[in-house]
């Protein structure tokens, strides 16, 4: 996992200066294109931070590693046939290509969570820091999980194309858990709304003091309550954000 993570990270780091801005509209359309064809009974869209940028697609696969003069070399691959047939030509973020590698090492090599962690840390060490910031990897802002969903949709399409029933069943089992993750994200959005409730409370306290409808003490108390609600909601929101790995 160390070599695979580092190799992908080094390749992507070279491509980073060629990156294009956040293209979340087309990335979400890409998900819709797959959903429309596959009919998976799931629907997921996500925002993405400005740090999430598209890069030229270069993938590596654990089954396509060569040894040249005693050193390992990765054979670069294109996107899958299913993606070429069903999706657009937009660039994907570096995290999307990492998740694609994660999916293949789990499928082909049986990697366990601790090995995935090593893979991720070695990749993270080589790519721009902004790509792996807390917000860039936040599940409520897309992060790694939306690209796992994308990868499983692609796996579903590939399994249908090649008649791979075992792989199809595995992808369907994964997709059944999507609704539970989305329900959790829905709860987080409720907590996030508490931030605006708190801000509104502070604004009301200010104008109530200005209009003298509340005493200074009561206005200050209301403003403090609003700030507690706002700060507390924001802390809970980020604390409960599902970890990327």
Regions from the language model: what does each represent?
Residues 85, 244-245:
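C-terminal end-of-chain micro-motif
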Residues 1-71, 80-100, 104, 122, ...:
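ATP-dependent phospho-/nucleotidyl transfer catalytic cores
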Residues 111-131, 135, 145-226, 230-233, ...:
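ATP/Mg2+ or Mg2+-diphosphate-binding catalytic cores
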